[in-house]
Amino acid sequence: MFDSVTGLIAEHDDLQQQLSDPELHSDPVRSKKVNRRYAELSRIVAAYTEWKQLTDDLEAARELAAEDDAFAAEIPGLEQGLEESEEKLRRLLIPRDPNDSRDAIMEIKMGEGGAESALFAGDLLSMYLHYADSRRWKAEIIEQTSSDLGGIKDVQVAFKGSSSDPAEGVWAHLKYEGGVHRVQRVPATESQGRIHTSAAGVLVFPEVDEPEEVEINPNDLKIDVFRSSGPGGQSVNTTDSAVRITHAPTGIVVSMQNEKSQLQNREAAMRVLRARLLAKQQEEADAEAAEFRKGQIRTMERSERIRTYNFPENRIADHRTGYKAYNLDAVMNGALGPVIESCILADEETRLANLSTD
């Protein structure tokens, strides 16, 4: 059992030697990749060491119990510990999403429901910012279009983590958030106290570590500049600082007007464009990544909800995993961990099942 770990241990030892080489740290891109892989393998090696020790301990206990019944009392505890250790190791050996250790760019857009939808989009942004803070991630709003009543029509925010462990990566957690989020509550503008249903859409992209990862031909870009506008469409800038970049081969369009500088808006637009192109390239190379990404788009286009936020009942429900809890107030303040963990667990169960059938 776990014969494949032998090769992973050898790879782990090789990476450990590489990390002691000063030349590695002169190449930030390679150094980052080596550190990430080393952190991932370290978890596997530690789990395997624990499993091997428990296996040996159980075997020894059984041999001793055959000679002296007094040792038999230790066997049930060791068997349970070995079972838990084996399950932990099996999960660690599930092939990971190669993007798990990446940072992420999230887009939140108002959907059905007009002004209430825009207000809910703002609430979702607040929820994710609080969640990021609880995980000690950095959050940067790179583009935001507000509504007349203080809500959000569209916002793009970049989340950056510090852990080299893929299991703790930003993308590893936020990738499950793509889709339609539905809210049920009494809007502040509702005088009759009736519950309204509205929705907001979320898209998530893995962020490109280095610009060189995604090759972009400058000749494929159409760049338009215009004056930035505020709620209602009124101009808020007297110079052409806003930027719209169209990538001709894919038709992807990214607009930025958050910064006062045209250069800063252009850099931000290119940052988002690279993330979207990376996602598209990976879709074309990986059928699983393609299906995952199409799932985000499909749910948004068909208005299929992935999650419902019911304020009158203080209830949150994830319709993909069956997760349900009555602590919506805490979730909206950033206590999103258990909801996302239910998605991670469901994903792992699916991957384990696929491994068993292969």
Swiss-Prot record:
GO cellular component: cytoplasm
Subcellular location field: Cytoplasm
Coiled coil feature spans: none
InterPro entries to which the protein is assigned, alphabetical: PCRF, Pep_chain_release_fac_I, Pep_chain_release_fac_I_sf, Prokaryotic/Mito_RF, RF-1
One protein family per Pfam: RF-1
PROSITE patterns: RF_PROK_I
Keywords: Cytoplasm, Methylation, Protein biosynthesis
Domain of life: Bacteria
Chief location category: cytoplasm
SMART domains the record matches: PCRF
SUPFAM superfamilies: Release factor
GO molecular function: translation release factor activity, codon specific
Modifications after synthesis and translation: Methylated by PrmC. Methylation increases the termination efficiency of RF1.
Modified residues (N5-methylglutamine): Q234
Family: Belongs to the prokaryotic/mitochondrial release factor family.
Annotated function: Peptide chain release factor 1 directs the termination of translation in response to the peptide chain termination codons UAG and UAA.
HAMAP family tied to this protein: Rel_fac_1
Protein's name in the database: Peptide chain release factor 1
Natural source organism: Leifsonia xyli subsp. xyli (strain CTCB07)
Gene: prfA
